[in-house]
Each structure stands twice: as structure tokens, then as C-alpha cells.
């Protein structure tokens, strides 16, 4: 039996073990090999980690929600305005448990329990790297829509379980609206009006 639950900071070491099983030492969030760093992020309420554990209480899956911070792959460093977007990130499944629907269960748990994380979220954005097709398909399955692309945004990323080359890495930007109560008037520059309307219609 696989149980989905929120990670307690006491079990962070088990999460690091999962990262190493999935990526070795190639994971690009290098700080997440540091136990104290993750504990501080959890205790400071910057992240909430959702995990999947097996019958032996071993962590075999994980996704993290970065919240109420301008943080992550496309953040505006140094901005002072409060951000009401969350970023689902760091989705990973133990190699021995893949293709069993665990990743989708983790995302569904996160989406169904957003109020436990932050009641003020307006939406979720997720910028999967272009070479990780599975994560893109998973976002689409759960209602995220493409709203942009950062071409060659990162230097080349080498991950132990993907085909790697010397190309720089691009990011897709996907978005899921959560709270659509407020209405904003946006005045579009004529030069970009058609493409902006196209993107907006795509994400509903």
C-alpha cells in the first residue's frame, strides 16, 4: 500500500535519500542535498512537501509546493511585493515505483489540499524543463496550460535518467488558475495583441 501525506521535517534525511536514488548527485537544486536547508525551508513555511511512502514507511515519491515567495526557476530576484502564486516542483519517483500512477496521486493530493498550504493562492505555475516530457504531460493531465517558454534559459542540465546533450535547457511555463474572483482590465500593446490573446485563450 502507498500512502500520500505531508512530509514532517523530522524525516528530511529520507527525502534526501530519495533524491540520491533518483538523480545521484546530479540534481540541479543542490541545496536540497543539505538536511538543515530543507528543514529551515519547511519550518519557515516557504515550502510544503508531499510524499508517498510504502508499507515500510520508506519515501518513494515526492512533490514540493513553493509558496508565497517569488522563488524558483522564473522568479524575480529582489522583488518586494507579496506573491500569491505557488510552484509545484521537485516531482520525483523512486525508480522501482515508476509507472504506477504515484506521480499523479501526489499532484492530486496537492491540488485537493491547497488550503492546508496557503488559503490566499491565486494560481499555480510550473516551469518544467523541455527535455522532461513526462512532467509536461502530467501537468496537462491536471489542468495546467502552456502560457510561455523561456528558450535556452538554463545552461545545459545533466540528469542521470535523461538523454543529455550540449544544448542549453529551455523551460515551458504552465499555469493553473485557482482563484478567479477578481477581474482586472489589461490594455494590450497592439504589436503583441494577437499572440497575447492566443496564449490567454489557451489557458482559459
Regions found by a protein language model. Name each.
Residues 1, 154-192:
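C-terminal "cap" of GNAT-fold acetyltransferases
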Residues 89-100, 128-130:
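A short, internal acetyl-CoA/4′-phosphopantetheine-binding micro-motif in the GNAT/acyltransferase core
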Residues 12, 16-95:
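A conserved beta-strand-loop-helix scaffold within acyl/acetyltransferase catalytic domains
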Residues 114-130:
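Conserved GNAT acetyl-CoA-binding A-motif
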Residues 2-15:
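A short beta-loop-alpha structural element at the N-terminal edge
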Residues 125-127, 140-163:
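Conserved catalytic-core motifs of GNAT/GCN5-like acyltransferases
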Residues 97, 101-109:
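Conserved acetyl-CoA pyrophosphate-binding loop and the N-cap/start of the following alpha-helix
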Residues 187-204:
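Short, cationic low-complexity segments
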Amino acid at each position: 500500500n502507498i500512502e500520500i501525506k505531508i512530509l514532517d521535517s523530522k524525516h528530511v534525511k529520507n527525502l534526501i535519500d530519495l533524491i540520491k536514488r533518483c538523480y545521484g548527485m546530479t540534481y540541479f537544486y543542490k541545496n536540497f542535498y543539505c538536511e538543515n536547508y530543507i528543514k529551515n525551508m519547511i519550518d519557515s513555511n516557504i515550502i510544503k512537501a508531499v510524499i508517498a511512502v510504502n508499507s515500510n514507511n520508506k519515501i518513494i515519491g515526492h512533490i514540493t509546493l513553493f509558496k508565497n515567495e517569488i522563488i524558483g526557476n522564473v522568479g524575480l530576484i529582489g522583488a518586494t511585493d507579496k506573491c500569491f502564486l505557488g510552484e509545484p516542483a521537485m516531482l520525483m519517483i523512486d525508480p522501482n515505483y515508476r509507472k504506477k500512477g504515484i506521480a499523479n496521486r501526489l499532484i492530486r493530493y496537492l491540488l485537493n489540499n491547497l488550503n492546508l498550504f496557503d488559503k490566499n493562492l491565486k494560481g499555480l505555475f510550473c516551469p518544467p524543463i523541455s527535455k522532461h516530457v513526462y512532467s509536461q504531460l502530467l501537468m496537462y493531465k491536471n489542468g495546467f496550460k502552456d502560457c510561455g517558454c523561456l528558450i535556452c534559459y538554463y545552461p545545459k542540465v545533466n540528469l542521470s535518467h535523461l538523454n543529455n546533450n550540449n544544448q542549453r535547457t529551455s523551460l515551458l511555463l504552465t499555469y493553473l488558475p485557482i482563484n478567479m474572483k477578481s477581474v482586472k482590465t489589461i490594455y494590450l500593446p497592439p504589436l503583441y495583441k494577437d499572440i497575447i490573446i492566443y496564449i490567454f485563450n489557451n489557458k482559459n
